[in-house]
A protein has these predicted regions:
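"A position-specific structural signal for the A-helix of alpha-solenoid helical repeats
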Residues: 17-21, 44, 69, 73-76, ...
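Residue at a conserved register position within TPR or TPR-like alpha-solenoid repeats
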Residues: 78-81, 123, 130, 171, ...
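Residue-level detector of the short coil/turn that links helix A to helix B
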Residues: 134, 182-183, 230, 275, ...
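Fold-core signature of tandem repeat domains
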Residues: 167-168, 191, 195-198, 215-218, ...
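TPR/TPR-like (Sel1-like) alpha-helical repeat modules
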Residues: 382-389, 425-439
Length: 446
């Protein structure tokens, strides 16, 4: 609304505040609508503030800061709705708008706790966009800005529980990116352990479901590292320690049972690797039951589909380790593949589904190697190379290189295990050829 009357401007801004407060309370309202409206509120308050830029009142300054935080928060809220779908014009447009508003706030030298927390939310969105684009350098830049902003907000308000929780969550997110994107285990472990320690201390102060779920996630991240390092005894100890904290919270509707199931799944896999098959079966089935229930409640949720597909692959690995019938194992893997294909229909460009599919093909290939089914093995290997080597060469995304070679090694080991020497040698040549192509294209050192 174009008006120069100050009372009218304030009345319009106040109306926008009241209307936005009502909108936020409406369930199922599109997050993008809330984000756009919050941007209008911020622009309105910004206009009033700029009219009195040389001598703004305390009220005008506070209203602008709160409006900026609401705009940042609603941008991040809308961002969650469209996460994990690859590069997306809608998410970029909203985040770039918020980024411009952040530059404006910095120019005004307004740096209270709310403003700094708003900065942190926008930086996190920017980091995620760069992650989706495989822009590792900018991803880590914005990620560090996100972490620094949450730390600064905590410094400004050290007694606030939520501010401390957000800083711990930012450290945990830094660990995730070091681990899953950069492949730096050493830095990831430092971040995960620091975040987990903070979450445990916060949980002792206030046993709220939010902090419980944060603690579950940070514990799961540590468990993932222990699994990658093959430290299965330590993994089981960490899982038991974590699950003991949620024993009396399983019926709490706010407890993230998906995280509980993920920890059960990891423990089951570790027990399988320790050859404790009976106990492993119990934990794997516990996890599968939770994932099945989640998918029944949310039949169109791609994450629920991925979770169930992953546990089915785990169970297939378990049955392989026990020497079960190969046809039964393939049937389970095919069920998992059906779930991942449906997830890809929902989010075609999802990097997470693609990585899960690589894991599934790894399991499938091993079954065919044990069966000595050369035609099926060749077909599966071609699918695997399409998702890994060809993808890396086409996009120059190097984040999958480490995973690809680890899977190649597992194929070779499985062929040797089944006394299929000719196939083991052929797979070794395939791996060496992949290395050669990556070196020639300057995607890895020779």
């Amino acid at each position: 609304v174009n008006t120069k009357d100050q009372d009218e401007k304030k009345a319009i801004a106040t109306f926008l505040w009241m209307f936005s407060s009502v909108m936020i309370m409406i369930e199922r309202l599109p997050a993008s609508m809330l984000s756009n409206f919050a941007a209008h509120v911020f622009n309105s308050e910004c206009g009033i503030y700029m009219d009195h830029y040389e001598h703004p009142t305390v009220e005008q300054t506070l209203r602008l800061q709160v409006a900026f935080y609401m705009m940042s928060s609603m941008t991040e809220f809308a961002f969650r709705d469209i996460k994990n779908v690859g590069s997306n014009d809608e998410q970029e447009k909203g985040t770039q708008r918020a980024f411009s508003n952040m530059s404006l706030m910095k120019g005004l030298n307004l740096s209270g706790t709310l403003v700094v927390e708003g900065f942190s939310l926008i930086y996190n969105c920017m980091a995620y966009i760069c992650e989706q684009k495989h822009d590792i350098k900018d991803m880590m830049f914005y990620n560090k800005q996100h972490e620094y902003a949450t730390c600064e907000a905590w410094r400004l308000n050290p007694d606030d529980f939520e501010t401390a929780r957000r800083y711990a969550a930012a450290v945990d997110e830094t660990g995730r990116r070091f681990y899953t994107v950069v492949g730096n285990f050493k830095e990831a472990v430092l971040c995960f352990e620091k975040a987990n320690e903070m979450f445990v201390e916060l949980f002792k102060q206030e046993k709220h479901s939010t902090i419980l779920n944060d603690m579950l996630l940070s514990s799961y991240n540590i468990i993932n590292i222990l699994n990658a390092e093959h430290l299965y005894d330590l993994l089981c100890m960490k899982a038991e320690e974590t699950l003991a904290l949620v024993t009396d919270r399983m019926d709490d509707p706010d407890t993230d049972l998906g995280l509980v199931a993920a920890i059960c799944e990891s423990k089951g896999h570790a027990l399988m690797m320790l050859k404790q098959f009976d106990e492993a079966w119990v934990w794997l089935n516990k996890a599968q039951k939770v994932y099945e229930d989640n998918l029944n409640k949310n039949p169109e949720d791609e994450k629920c589909m991925r979770d169930l597909a992953i546990i089915k692959c785990r169970i297939a690995d378990y049955l392989m380790a026990k020497g079960s019938d190969a046809d039964n194992i393939i049937a389970i893997v095919n069920e998992a593949e059906g779930l991942l294909k449906k997830a890809l229909d929902i989010v075609p460009d999802s990097p997470k589904v693609a990585k899960n599919y690589i894991g599934l093909l790894s399991t499938k290939m091993k079954v065919y190697l044990l069966k000595r089914d050369i035609n099926a093995a060749d077909e599966t290997l071609a699918q695997f190379e399409k998702l890994t080597l060809k993808h890396i060469l086409n996009t120059r995304d190097t984040s999958l290189i480490q995973l690809m070679f680890a899977v190649y090694d597992s194929f070779i080991d499985t062929a040797v295990q089944s006394d299929w020497t000719q196939m083991a040698n052929a797979l070794l040549q395939v791996k060496q050829n992949a290395e050669k192509q990556l070196v020639e294209n300057r995607l890895m050192k020779g």
